[in-house]
Amino acid sequence: MEEDMYVDIFLDPYTFQDDFPPATSQLFSPGAPLDVHPLNPSNPETVFHSHLGAVKKAPSDFSSVDLSFLPDELTQENKDRTVTGNKVTNEESFRTQDWQSQLQLPDEQGSGLNLNSNSSPDTQSCLCSHDADSNQLSSETPNSNALPVVLISSMTPMNPVTECSGIVPQLQNVVSTANLACKLDLRKIALNAKNTEYNPKRFAAVIMRIREPRTTALIFSSGKVVCTGAKSEDESRLAARKYARVVQKLGFPVRFFNFKIQNMVASCDVKFPIRLEILALTHRQFSSYEPELFPGLIYKMVKPQVVLLIFASGKVVLTGAKERSEIYEAFENMYPILESFKKV
């Protein structure tokens, strides 16, 4: 009895109605601790019912409900609101479909942003609301200076171009190598041959020059010779043989082996200025443009493997080719690209 009085005095029965489970809960099972005492169900004020219990079913008969406050027919104002809401909904759905079609790339299905069924509803709702706001702002304040969105393809043409540009790159330098097939005394060559330089602390080769053809050779002690400065393949071969004959006259058993063209450099002018910034942005996979370090754009073509130095004035330098045909092919492939980025 003391416990019942304690509950009646200090506890509010309405609080228990929301916070405590009913007396039939597992807390009052025989397995509960001994210091927990069940409430007396005989007292109506101490019988609790939990709001977590069975949910009452809503009545299906609405005949007793007062619906007199609802109008029988729509007024003219309500009709106008309904028509306006339908128009706004149709406009938003049309803008959303138009926005989805613009984001979907025509050539690459599945790439880019699109509102597909796999995206979450939250993402779709955010994107749709953002699109509606942006379309509303753009319709209110149109921008006449906005540039059209153009699909940019960063692919170098691999197929030969049928139309000829009419520009032929001119060879400026041909680098070749040869093997004299014997060991050489570089000090002896430097002391007895004309037009030579030799500083072993600076460079471990003899630098020799001849006037015809006007070239320079690097002669190493292993017998390797590098000839540079020739304007054609034939001039490079002739110059390499002349260097071998000079060394042979100094008493070395020289033989001329393994002549090979290692690099060819050519240049030309397309006669129009080029927008290097946009070209570098479009063909970023193949080009490198750092105007603070070098004023030209470095374009590395895949096929043929030729490096082009493109300047804003329209001058083009081609290097890295080992045959003359590679230079012509690389320039003919590059010329249509340069025309598309001509400054107007």
Curated annotation (Swiss-Prot):
Biological process (GO), any one: DNA-templated transcription initiation
One MF annotation (Gene Ontology) recorded for this entry: RNA polymerase II general transcription initiation factor activity
Keywords, alphabetical: Cytoplasm, Developmental protein, DNA-binding, Nucleus, Transcription, Transcription regulation
Keyword field contains Transcription regulation: yes
A GO term from the CC aspect: female germ cell nucleus
Subcellular location: Cytoplasm; Nucleus
Pfam families: TBP
PROSITE patterns, A to Z: TFIID (PS00351)
Functional description taken from the UniProt entry: Transcription factor required in complex with TAF3 for the differentiation of myoblasts into myocytes. The complex replaces TFIID at specific promoters at an early stage in the differentiation process.
Subunit composition and interactions: Interacts with TAF3.
The protein, known as: TATA box-binding protein-like 2
Provenance organism: Rattus norvegicus (Rat)
